[in-house]
Swiss-Prot record:
GO terms for biological process: mitochondrial electron transport, ubiquinol to cytochrome c. One of its GO terms (cellular component) is mitochondrial inner membrane. It is found in: Mitochondrion inner membrane. This is Cytochrome b. Heme 1 (or BL or b562) is low-potential and absorbs at about 562 nm, and heme 2 (or BH or b566) is high-potential and absorbs at about 566 nm. The lineage of its organism: Eukaryota, Metazoa, Chordata, Craniata, Vertebrata.
Length: 379
């Protein structure tokens, strides 16, 4: 009798994706983040579903319903904080996953990479809309400021903003539609993840050397299933420490004040995972220029395959490019810090310099370093 997992139409797909998948024998812990992202997505959908059972998307009761979840619903507090801090874990894994792709040249798998960039945009949009739902001060003003950026679009900007708001300000209509989109988008993300994996399994995984690994592959199960489970345990350990000991560490205290359109918080800022892009947006005095820079800060990832000039795929054996990569990482940390600071001296100039350096490294310095390394190899 033929093994059922190899013959059954449905089990066959799972078998080819998770069990008998030929995987390079030398992939490191940096390849764990894909599976961790899958677990994060599952956790967010599950906790989000239970939160949606008790949440009301009305401006008068939204804030109270979140309080009710935390105080009166059985284990509501842990569901709420797992969802809020699960988003932070999601973005930590997401940034490390993208960073891995940049370091080891995984962007040369064009379809997989481009779907990944679309996924990044979709997850960011979902997280932004989720941040609006508790209807605290930062939720309301964050929604007002970020959606208002669309008014910078020439000619149609103002109409577009009012169309998104469903009125002349962020109000009940905005909250209701944001809740609807926040609920549906994770399922669209799940579909995109399947497409992402489909394209990845067409080419097979990259590996740290960036070389062809067809000659040395091992089955995904049991080797990498065990490795992934270890990753899950470590991630859940960190998540539970965060949820049980300091659940509000990554949040904003202003969000514990109900939304008030008549009172602007002294410093409006998004969640920590958007601060780098927010710093780039604020570093340009012109509104339209800032919005374009904000979009380009993520969209620039699509250009990476075109900016690849090196004869080698990975940065593993390229010391000059390695230095630039880690300067870029430090620059992103700087931008994240600046995004959380008030708009005053010296933070303005630091933010502007960090923003220039961000684009300069990716668009100019990395491609030049690749050309230089090619020449050094020929000496």
């Amino acid at each position: 009798m033929i093994n059922m997992r190899k013959s059954h139409p449905l089990l066959k797909i799972i078998n080819h994706s998770l069990i008998d998948l030929p995987t390079p024998s030398n992939i490191s812990v940096w390849w764990n983040f894909g599976s961790l992202l899958g677990v994060c997505l599952g956790l967010q959908i599950l906790t989000g579903l239970f939160l949606a059972m008790h949440y009301t998307s009305d401006t008068l009761t939204a804030f109270s319903s979140v309080t009710h979840i935390c105080r009166d619903v059985n284990y509501g507090w842990i569901i709420r904080y797992l969802h809020a801090n699960g988003a932070s874990m999601f973005f930590i894994c997401l940034f490390l996953h993208v960073g891995r792709g940049m370091y080891y040249g995984s962007y040369n798998y064009l379809e997989t990479w481009n779907i990944g960039v679309i996924l990044l945009f979709t997850v960011m949009a979902t997280a932004f809309m989720g941040y609006v739902l508790p209807w605290g001060q930062m939720s309301f003003w964050g929604a007002t400021v970020i959606t208002n950026l669309l008014s910078a679009i020439p000619y149609v900007g103002t109409s577009l903003v009012e169309w998104i708001w469903g009125g002349f300000s962020v109000d009940k209509a905005t909250l209701t539609r944001f809740f609807a989109f926040h609920f549906i988008l994770p399922f669209i993300i799940t579909a995109l993840v399947i497409v992402h994996l489909l394209f990845l399994h067409e080419t097979g995984s990259n590996n740290p050397t960036g070389l062809n690994s067809d000659a040395d592959k091992i089955p995904f199960h049991p080797y990498y299933t065990i490795k992934d489970i270890l990753g899950f345990i470590i991630m859940f350990l960190f998540l539970m420490i965060l949820v049980l000991f300091s659940p509000d560490m990554l949040g904003d205290p202003d969000n514990y004040t109900p939304a008030n359109p008549l009172n602007t918080p002294p410093h409006i800022k998004p969640e920590w995972y958007f601060l780098f892009a927010y710093a780039i947006l604020r570093s340009i005095p012109n509104k339209l220029g800032g919005v374009l820079a904000l979009i380009l800060s993520i969209l620039i990832l699509i250009l990476l395959p075109m900016l690849h000039t090196s004869a080698q795929r990975s940065l593993m054996f390229r010391p000059i490019s390695q230095c630039l990569f880690w300067i870029l990482v430090a620059d992103l940390f700087t931008l994240t810090w600046i995004g959380g600071q008030p708009v005053e001296h010296p933070f303005i100039i630091i933010g502007q310099l960090a923003s220039i350096l961000y684009f300069l490294i990716i668009l100019v310095m990395m491609p030049l370093a690749g050309i230089l390394e090619n020449k050094i190899m020929k000496i």
